[in-house]
Structures are given as C-alpha cells and as structure tokens.
Curated annotation (Swiss-Prot):
NCBIfam families: CPSaseII_lrg (TIGR01369), PRK05294.1 (NF003671), PRK12815.1 (NF009455). Pathway: Amino-acid biosynthesis; L-arginine biosynthesis; carbamoyl phosphate from bicarbonate: step 1/1; Pyrimidine metabolism; UMP biosynthesis via de novo pathway; (S)-dihydroorotate from bicarbonate: step 1/3. Residues 547-929 are annotated as: Carbamoyl phosphate synthetic domain. This is Carbamoyl phosphate synthase large chain.
Length: 1062
C-alpha cells in the first residue's frame, strides 16, 4: 500500500547518550530514519539528549530538540508540537521504553497520537518475558524452561526446582543489563535482586541455561501486508552464554547446514508474523550443535545493534526501510537504494565473509572484572570484510587498535599451561589470543573444544592461521607462501616479524612481485544485478572493482571503534568534513572500520572503504586512489597516529603538517614553544626511568600529575599525593622508554576550560570557551562544562583568546585545534594543545551555529576564514546557556572504580540548554538520569582534606529539606557546626545493623551519595565499597564537590527556601 496521507508530522525519539549496550548504532539508524521520512515528505520532530551525534544536527529533522529523555520533558514537547504520530522503534531500548511510559500516562490517547511501526501490544508481547514465552508455546516454538518472577524468593524457589546453571534476564532492559548466569543459590539471589531493581517493570525471567549451544541471529523485516524477509543471518563464534554484543560474530552463518538454516529461518519468520512487527526486528536462537534441537532466546522488536551490523554487512539499509514501512509502504514498492533496480523484498546475498569483533574498555580499566557473560561490557565494535573467514578475522583483529596487531599476544605467550587453560575455560576479552597460543603449543582441536565449547569449524579457522604462521616462518621470502598468506589476511608487519624484516621491506617485496590488493564492491546481491554502490573492501583476488573517477579526491580517515576517550564525537567531525569536501567539488573518500557509525553509511561519502585503520591498509587505498591528500584532523588520535607514516611514504597530509603536529605533541618541543612565547604553564619535568620520575616528583613537590606522552582520554594519568602512591602507579601502569617518556607536572588546583580554535595561518577563530564545572584534576571528558563561561571575566576571556592565537600561529596550525587551560588567581596556564578536532566539536557546533568541522575543512583546502565570512578572535556568545554532562556505564563494569580523576571513564554525554544556568544544569542532570527528589536523604563520605569545603554544601542541602547522613568523623564535624546529622556506622563496623552504611543503601534509604574518598582505590577499602554499592543500587553518586555544588544550584532553583525572619 502507498504511504499514508493522513499523517503529516512525526516525532522520532532518539536513544540518548552512549552507554555500554547502546552505542553509535542508534545515531546511524536514527539519522537514516529521519532522512527517510523527510524523503517521503513528512515533517520530522526529533527529541534526543545527545549533542555528540549527527542525528541531532538541524539538517536531519525539521525540528530538533536536544532535551532530557524523560516523560515530563517529552510530554511538554508533544503539547508544543502536536505530532500526528511517534516512531519509537529506532531509538534503541531507551526510545522504546519512553514510548511505553508515555502511553501509560494517557497523553497519546488524549491527543490522539498514534505509535507508528510495531504496535504497543506487539512490543509488550516481545519485551515482556512471560507473554513472549506463552506466545512461543502457542506457536509450538521451543523455549528453555523458565519462569517470570517479581521477587528474589520466587527466583530462588524456581532455581532450586529446575537446577543450575540458570540465566537471569530482566524485562525491558538492553545490553543484558542486570542479568547473568548463576551457578548456585547465592549467585541467583544477588543477580535476581539486581535485575529486579534495574527492570523498569520489576520483572525477570529465570531460565534454564543453554550455555554451549550455537548462537544464531536473524535480522528480519516485515511490512503491513505481511510480506516478510530475512536481511541477514549471523553466527556467533562464541557459544550461548556470552552476550551477543560481546561475541565475535560472522555473517553469513558459517556452520549451518541447509536444513538447519531453513528451520531457523522459518522459525524467525513465524515469530515476526505472529508478533505483527512492522519494520525491522532481531531474532536470537540457540541451536544444539549435536542435533536439530533449538530454542528461541529472544526477539528485539526494534532496530538494534545487530541491525547496524547487518546493514553494513549486507549494504541493505534496515533503518531506512523500517521507517518507510512504518508509514505504510510495503517491501515490494520500496526501491533497494543499493542496486537502484531491485526492490526491498529481495533478500541480500553475500559473496564474502564479514567478521565483527567487540572493542572492550579494559585497556582503560585494568582492575575491572574482564569475564564475559550475559551482561554486555564492550563499548564498541569493528567489522572487517574478506573473501575467507580467516582474512575477515585477521583484518578485524588489526582494526581493534589494541596492543595486539595479530593473533600473537606476549601475555598469552608467557602464560603457563595452567593459566592458558583457565583463560580458555573462563572467557575474557583476550580469549582469541589464548586460543591461538594453545594451537602454537600443539593442543588439538578436541582439547580446545572441550575447554571452550567453541564450534570445531571456528577453532579450525584459528588453527589454520597458526599453521600458516609456521609456514611463513619456515619459508622466508617465498613468493607463493606470501601470496597465500595475504589471501588469509596476514599483514605486512606480521609477516615482517616472522621473517625478521621490516614492514617496509615486506611491502616492497610484495609489490615487486605484483602482490597487491584488489577492491570488491558490497552490492547486496552477490553481483547478480548491476549495482552502483561506492562501498568497497580489500582482498587478494583477481579482479579489481574500484576505479579512480578522474575527479580531484581527498581521503578522510575515520576514528575506528567507539572506545572511552574516542567516541561518536569524532565520527560527527568526520561526516562534516566529508560534507564540506563535497560542497567544494571534491570526491570525498572515507576509510573506517566501525559498523555502528554514520560515516560508514555508503550514502554519506562518494566512496567508502571498509578497512582497518593501519598504515598498510590506508596506504593500499592511497596507492589506488592517488588523492590530492589525506585529512587526519577529525579521526581522533587514531588518524593523527597514522600521519607520520603516511607522509614518510609520500602521501600528502592536508592541514597542519606532521612536523607541527609533533611540535604540539612532543613534550620537550612544546615546552620550548611555551618558553619562547613567555606563556604560563604548570611546572613540569620529563623522565625516562622510574628513578627519574620519583626524583622529578620530589623536586616539584606533591601532589603531582603523572602521565605518559602521546595518549588520548587521559589513559594512565593520575594525581599522586605521595611517594608510595607514585611507586604503585609506576608498578601498575607504565612502560617507560627513551621514546616514551613520563610527564610529571605540578598539580594546579584551578578552574579548567577547553577552547576549540580554527586557524588559517593568518586569522584564528575561537567559536567558544567551555568552562569546566569541576576543578582541575577531573579529565575534561568527565567534567561537566558550561558555555558561555559563568565565572570568567572579560579580561580572562581576552587572555585566553590572545594565548590561543599566539599558539595557533606559532604552531602553524591550519585547520582545527583544541587547547586546555587552567585559570587560577586571574592567570591563564596552558595545560596542553591537541592539533586536531576534540570531543567538544559537536557540542560547540550545535550551540554556536558554527559548523566547526566544515569551516576547518574549508580552511584545510585553502579557503580563508575571511572568505568564509568569519572574523578573528572570540565569536560572540549566544543568550542561551548550555551545559554538557558526562554519562557513565559503571553499572555494566564490576570492579571499576567510579571515583573521577584525570583518566577518562565516561562513555557518553548529554546537553541541557536554557535561559538560566540553574535551569540548564537541571536539564543536564535530568538527561544524565540524575533526577533527584526536592527533598530526600544525602549520604556524605568525605576525605579529611575536604571537610571545610563540605560544610557550606551540607548547609545548603539542609536548607532545601534534605536529611544528612554521615559516618562518625564527618558527622562530628558537621554537628559542631550546628547541623543535624543522622549517624551511620562504617562499612566494616557492625555489618548486620540497620544503620550500617551499606544496609542504608541496600534498603533504599539514600537518594544521593557524595563520596570524595579518592585514596580508597583497593577493592576492600571503605570508599571503594560505598561507591560500588551506590552503583549497584542505582543511587546517584558524585565524587567531586564542584559537581555537588552544581547539583545544588539546580535543586535550589526548583525548591523554595524556608527562612525565619529573625
């Protein structure tokens, strides 16, 4: 049926900030959906709280609201806009849950607003564990024995009845939040309690574990006329028991027989039809490897993480099709945009293999529990395409941007056989490298299968690569072996290590023998129909399908997988760089490895190469395309790190030169510039040995800030207060070498700020200065920030502007740069300069109206700021005040300390804007899920050195009606100052008492925890345990007093003070 004419205005609910379990894939799907609806002539109103995304650009929807995703906030917008319908199935679990919550308030019925796409009843039937189980039984589809419970007691009773192991699956959550595998009553009681608290409907499914089965996923589409089709079938490398978001995944499925495939396909289609889902949906199934028995795990009645992967794996734009189906169109009348000739009902066919590997944050969180299970822990993922499973997997491994560039891990190599076997049995993020090591040591396929339950086929792929490794080692400079190794995805540096040569020598040898990659097209139809997609992957095969167009081209290097410190903000900048190049008439070519993002949507750039971001892979594309040059400023540290290698091979780096980038990033060279310009900076020393670091710290005087050079996201950065802490830091973190010195800085406690600037070599434009709300010492990515600044005088802003201009011109910056300052006692100190786009670009672009990445790209390509209509210096400030607040994923990562310091820990951000600072703060806190009651109970656990600072904060809490709880030391101090305080006993004192601090938290007596015990970093220390308990109980937690001060400003604005007259 043709699209509906009875609706005109559609509201799309976005997915909010990036957290573990819900990352950039919803920026991609939401952007696609909004554009698809506008393409069909509908007016689109978008609500999302995340400023870092392309989705919240004003070009994506007719009206964009960056507001908190709360029922109150969205209800206000609905009453203002009066949409005819809401499309909730493209904003992840957040969008879906918000639609359900809005429906329950009655506002949708009251204003006669329809939910488009999958109907409410179907969503509830798929998401409510009990209803879904009953539906499967009616359809005759098998599900594991299970029971829906609302209490811990009911969970334990059922567990005892059916026996362990058991899986807990909370209702209406995503990323496996709150769930887990339980091997006994104690584990079940703990996990069920947590799951019930995190489920918005206080409900969990307790299910007999089927761990060890094959895990298969189908991405399915269905329209209003009951046409249904399979877009993609994916198979997990890891068996059931590890969350699919934490599993290595292959597409198409690798081990299913035709009978198994058809059986599971029929089941998926039967489910989507029975649920009457309209749009995209993800079906997860478990197949017994030894029979034809299978079980249905779950159905996601929405576009999901797997949909983004399936879209990129096949080229079939699922979210775009789902949006068109939602407005009444059918699969047989929507054109497939890839071929331009076939229709959307044709099932994609793949003549290649796709491999996805998750990207985990454990390089940041070394003390975290790395065990993988049913609760997702990865922050992002990479995808690679090859002609063989081996090639796809090797390309995916080197896309991860971790220490391991292939299947060799030094840590695995050094492990004893006992440790190796433990690592195989208990899956962690590095299991793949231990699998490879097992085969190097001669373990048989049977041995490894027995330990891991991973399918023999997948183990054989890993074993084959290790055999190939051995052949390479034994046949140095053998051309036929080299050709075969390249077909199986071996990189030049890996081969160089095996041959005892350099990567450049291998590259030259390979090219001399005509061993160069060709590029194949991703066309959805295995070349069955003519296709025009400019979407390519490399392989070592015969025919090349990518040809130079003859137009002037520029290559833009993306930012790779989403990880802490390098998030979706860099993808935003990449996409805007591409747009600017296209407007200037250049052919814009993107190289990236992340399937979740907008930049890897083939319709964004003129050509997309889905490749690892390594020197070899990028050079191969440069060899083919011969671009005017490469832009590296927008891909974070990933692309900056490639610049020197590319230039050494004759590739032109556009914008700031490699030499000048090095002058900004090399500490010694940068210090020379600061001295030459007579600028202030915290005193600092550089050391290349452990002894040198300790000597430097003692010379400067504690506290000091220590960090390695050349890092992003404050990795391995800490404030240390004495020699003992410094020695622990050196032991835990750091490999020091002459070319990787450690920087030791005097720690300045002042007000920090971020400046993004664009320079054309003559003029320097500062779109804005962002003032951090927390004092120096909290990483800029974890700080709340406000624009325009609230405490800086005009004189300070002028000083910041002058210093920025001096640095930009001295560093010969052409394009964009970011500078961090500390303001203290009216003086401005330079902390660091990043000669690239920073994570604040999307936020500042949206609130200033200056498209910073586009302006910078035009500058890079030779168009001056004046020619673009911009002046020199600080841009004028708007009337609106905007606050950026970080969002964390601590609830997904056991044992990660939530105390904030110089190493970045946040996974996403939200924005609040209003006409007053207090209201903007309130919206930012609400967006970050820190909505507090007007009066409640606050628990204060404070370091001795913060006692004086807590007094005014505690008094303000008391004035707005909060009860104050504290342990003895803090309580005595506050009582002496005339405050009423409820005493709680310490963590290890009288653990059974009701007033024990942990029991107060467990019993939901506390609404907010303020904990500044930063030295309590050991897992058994009071400060750490209190922070962990607050996270587990979902109680808002603050670890900086400046944040508490900001929160009070927001709360005071909502509350009425009650003061006596006398």
């Amino acid at each position: 049926m043709p699209k509906r004419k009875d609706i005109h205005k559609i509201m799309v609910i976005g997915s909010g900030p990036i957290i573990i379990g819900q990352a950039a894939e919803f920026d991609y799907s939401g952007t696609q959906a909004c554009l698809a609806l506008r393409e069909e002539g509908y007016q689109v109103v978008l609500v999302n709280s995340n400023p870092a995304t392309i989705m919240t650009d004003t070009t994506i929807a007719d009206k964009v609201y960056i507001e908190p995703l709360t029922v109150d906030s969205i209800s206000r917008i609905i009453r203002q806009e009066y949409p005819d319908a809401i499309l909730p199935t493209l904003g992840g679990q957040v969008g879906l849950n918000m639609a359900l919550a809005l429906a329950k308030t009655g506002i949708l019925d009251e204003l006669n607003i329809e939910l488009l796409g999958t109907k409410l009843k179907s969503i509830e039937q798929a998401e409510d564990r009990e209803q879904f189980k009953n539906l499967c039984k009616e359809l005759g589809e098998p599900v594991p024995p299970s029971k829906t419970v609302n209490t811990v007691e009911a969970a334990v009773e059922f567990g005892d009845e059916i026996g362990y192991p058991i899986i807990v699956r909370p209702a209406f959550t995503m990323g496996g939040t709150g769930g887990g595998i339980c091997h006994n009553r104690k584990e079940l009681a703990e996990i069920a309690k947590n799951g019930l608290e995190l489920s918005p409907v206080t409900e969990c499914l307790i299910e007999k574990s089927i761990a060890g089965y094959k895990e298969i996923e189908f991405e399915v589409m269905r329209d209003h006329d009951d046409n249904a089709m399979i877009v993609c079938c994916m198979e997990n490398f890891d068996p059931v028991g590890i969350h699919t978001g934490d599993s290595i995944v292959f597409s198409p499925s690798q081990t299913l027989s035709d009978k198994e495939y058809q059986m599971l396909r029929d089941c998926s289609l039967k489910l989507i039809r029975a649920l009457k889902i309209e749009g995209g949906c993800n079906v997860q199934l478990a197949l017994d490897p030894n029979s034809f028995d299978y079980d249905v795990i779950e159905v996601n009645p929405r576009v999901s993480r797997s949909s983004a992967l399936a879209s990129k794996a096949t080229g079939y734009p699922i979210a775009k099709m789902a949006a068109k189906i939602a407005v009444g169109m059918t699969l047989d009348e929507i054109k497939n945009p890839v071929t331009g000739t076939t229709y959307a009902e044709f099932e994609p066919a793949l003549d290649y293999v796709v491999c996805k590997i998750p990207r985990w944050p454990f390089d940041k969180f070394q003390k975290a529990d790395r065990t993988l299970g049913t609760q997702m822990k990865a922050t992002g993922e990479v995808m690679a395409i090859g002609r063989t499973a081996e090639e796809a997997m090797q390309k995916a491994v080197r896309s991860l941007e971790i220490d391991e560039k292939d299947l060799y891990s030094e840590e695995a190599h050094r492990a004893s056989d006992d440790k190796l076997e433990q690592k195989l049995v208990k899956a962690q993020d590095d299991r793949l490298f231990y699998l490879a090591e097992a085969f190097r040591r001669g373990y048989s396929l049977e041995d490894v299968h027995e330990l891991t339950k991973i399918n023999f086929y997948f183990l054989d792929i890993v074993k084959h690569m290790i055999e190939m490794e051995k052949e390479l080692k034994e046949n140095k400079d053998e051309v036929d072996i080299l050709r075969l190794a390249k077909k199986y995805g071996f990189s030049d540096p890996t081969i160089a290590n095996l041959w005892g040569e350099t990567a450049d020598e291998v590259r030259d040898f390979r090219k001399a023998h005509g061993i160069i990659p060709v590029y194949k097209m991703v066309d959805t139809c295995a070349a069955e129909f003519e296709s025009q997609t400019p979407y390519f992957y490399s392989t070592y095969d015969a025919e090349n399908e990518s040809h130079r167009s003859g137009k002037k081209s520029v290559i833009v290097i993306g930012s790779g997988p989403i990880r802490i410190g390098q998030g979706v903000e860099f993808d935003y900048a990449t996409v805007h760089c591409v747009k600017a190049l296209q407007k200037m008439g250049y052919e814009a070519i993107v190289i990236n490895s992340n399937p979740e993002t907008v930049s890897t949507d083939f319709s964004v750039s003129d050509k997309l190469y889905f490749e690892p971001l390594t020197l070899e892979d990028v050079l191969n594309v440069c060899d083919l395309e011969e671009p005017e040059g490469v832009i590296v400023q927008f891909g974070g540290q990933t692309s900056i790190n490639l610049a020197a290698g590319l230039e050494a091979h004759g590739v032109k780096i556009l914008g700031t030169t490699v030499k000048d980038v090095n002058r900004a990033e090399d500490r010694k060279l940068f210090d020379d510039i600061i001295k030459e310009l007579k600028l202030n900076q915290p005193q600092g020393l550089t050391a290349t040995t452990h002894e040198g670091v300790i000597e430097a710290a003692e010379k400067l005087g504690y506290p000091v800030l220590v960090r390695p050079s050349y890092v992003l996201g404050g990795k391995a950065m800490e404030i240390v207060y004495n020699k003992k802490e410094l020695e622990e830091y050196l032991q835990d973190h750091v490999d020091i070498a002459a070319d990787h010195p450690i920087l030791v800085d005097d720690y300045l406690d002042g007000r920090e700020c971020d400046v993004d600037a664009i320079s054309d070599g003559y003029d320097v434009l500062l779109p804005g200065i962002m003032e951090h709300i927390e004092h120096a010492g909290v990483h800029s990515g974890d700080s709340m920030a406000v624009y325009p600044p609230q405490t800086f005088t005009d004189e300070i802003k002028e000083k910041i502007t002058e210093v920025t201009k001096k640095l930009a011109l001295t560093l010969n910056c052409v394009g964009i740069m970011n500078i961090q300052f500390i303001v203290r006692d009216g003086e401005v100190y330079v902390i660091e300069v990043n000669p690239r786009a920073s994570r604040t670009v999307p936020f500042l672009s949206k609130i200033t109206g200056i498209e910073m990445a586009q302006v910078a790209t035009r500058v890079i390509m030779g168009e001056s700021l004046k020619e673009q209509g911009y002046g020199d210096g600080l841009a004028s400030e708007p009337d609106m005040i905007s606050v950026k607040a970080p969002v964390f994923s601590f609830s997904k990562l056991a044992d990660v300390d939530s105390y904030l310091g110089p190493e970045m820990k946040s996974t996403g951000e939200v924005m609040g804007s209003d006409h007053t600072f207090a209201k903007a703060l309130y919206k930012a806190f609400a967006g970050a899920k820190m909505q507090l009651p007007e009066n409640g109970n606050v628990l204060l656990t404070i370091e001795d050195r913060d006692k004086d600072k807590i007094l005014p904060i505690a008094k303000r809490f008391a004035r707005i009606g909060y009860r104050i709880f504290a342990t003895k030391g803090t309580a005595d101090f506050l009582k002496k100052n005339d405050l009423h305080v409820d005493l709680v006993t310490k963590v290890h004192e009288d653990e059974q008492a009701d007033d024990n601090i942990l029991n107060e938290l467990r019993n939901n007596k506390i609404d907010l925890v303020i904990n500044t015990m930063g030295h309590d970093i050991e897992k058994n220390s009071d400060g750490f345990i209190i922070r962990q308990m607050a996270i587990q109980q979902n109680v808002p937690l603050l670890t900086a007093l400046d944040t508490a001060d900001a929160l009070l400003t927001a709360l005071e604005n909502r509350s009425f003070a009650t003061d006596a007259l006398q």
